[in-house]
Amino acid sequence: MKQLHPVMFVGTGSDVGKSVLAAAFCRIFRQDGYQPAPFKAQNMALNSYATPDGFEIGRAQAVQAEAAGIPCHTDMNPLLLKPQSDHTSQVILHGKPVGNKHAYDYWRRQGDKKTRRQDVTIDYRAEVCTAFDRLSAKYNPIVMEGAGSISEINLRDTDLVNLPMARHAKADVILVGDIDRGGVFASVYGSIALQSPEDRKLIRGIIINKFRGDMRLFDEGRRMLEELCGIPVLGVVPYFKDIHIEEEDSVALAQKSWQLMQGKINVAVVMLQHLSNYTDFDALERDPRVHLFYTNNVDDISKADIIILPGTKSTLSDLYELRRNGCAQAIIKAHREGASVLGICGGYQLMGMEVCDPHHFEGDIDRLPGLGLLPITTTMNGEKRTRQVKCDYGTGYEIHMGETIPFGDAPAKPLTILDDGRSDGYVVSDKCMGTYIHGILDNAAFVDKLLSPFADKIEHVGAAFDYQAFKEQQYDKLAAHVRKYVDIDKIYHILSD
């Protein structure tokens, strides 16, 4: 196939649709016979994923790699920032943690400058550029994604991910604007006007995203935008709700319906303050037997058939908050009255007798009593376990810190045995269990086990749900949607010019 330039999707702001458009083009290029790969130099997200070789990257790049039909790799997202508080993030470089950074130190004092880790000098800009170079030697084209807005001129000197990265990659840049939030003319024109003359030349096209209504009403707007900016509008993509791509940000979770439904098993996912890896529940949410909702309301929790405690980036902080807001007591009471409780990763730790952090890896709290639903104890340590796993129920992945063992003289009752012979999780009964395995709910065998105590509540049972096949269908639907409204031939011309 002909060698194409890298393409980079940048935005007028956050949540304009860069990640989804990048996934769409990963699938489009694959359908057209190319071997694309995604790349985002630096990502900030709690929703991460374990690569096949046991390292950690942002979930969006894992999704984009899946759309491209290739295994994910740390070179696709060499630098990941995982917020631990309002001001501090864990820095993941090439899939492994290298320490915590205060936001001011990272963005204002250091950013791309050299820092020291255990007497080793780290140059973040050099690291991400080298990762890109390795990736571009293997795949064609590279589908790059920027971060946030390209107009944050106060952070330009430390920017690793937007136009400075495009310059290194010699990428053709496409600016994405979100018309649904309003002000698209100002945001697109302003984003371009605030760039240096050198960087403005990199922007080869504009895509207007999330359009609602009659497309013909924007014909004049499209012409005016092209005249204002001197850059072609390559497409106007309508807003959609019928295509389901795993999301990286949890903005929409609280908007999902919480009302109980008759004829289905009602599953409450507890909305922790530091909830992470909420894509654990995407497959369960699509299961026709289930009505899944997110809540931290004690009344909602008390009415659920199944309560799931999800992963968290700050176990002790969320445990403290659960006790403060009454959710801990509501979960214990609901379980006593017949509800099932499942904990995943940090949620598994919460279900134990205690969580200890004697060396303060998470914060200032030394120890807190857990919910007492499982006879286990967890001690936080500095080692992060990151790997993909196989177990009796199927596949998944681990991303966690802390060691969990039976409490006192409690016997070991693992939920499953992993492919390397290690035991995972703890099970008291079919209505009380925990696991470290993210993605376990993607496996039909485990979902059947979880739902079995409430099978008599299901009024209509359809065909078995194949989540992997569903995801493939969604990538194809997304590609078809973008092909319909974006000038793909023009983009190929730009990338070949």
Residue ranges and their predicted role:
Residues 1-333, 340, 382, 391-497:
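Flexible phosphate-sensing "switch/lid" loops adjacent to ATP/NTP-binding sites
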Residues 348-349, 441:
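Short active-site segment of divalent metal-dependent hydrolases/proteases
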Residues 352-404:
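A conserved active-site-flanking secondary-structure segment within enzyme catalytic domains
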Residues 345:
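Catalytic nucleophile serine of serine hydrolases
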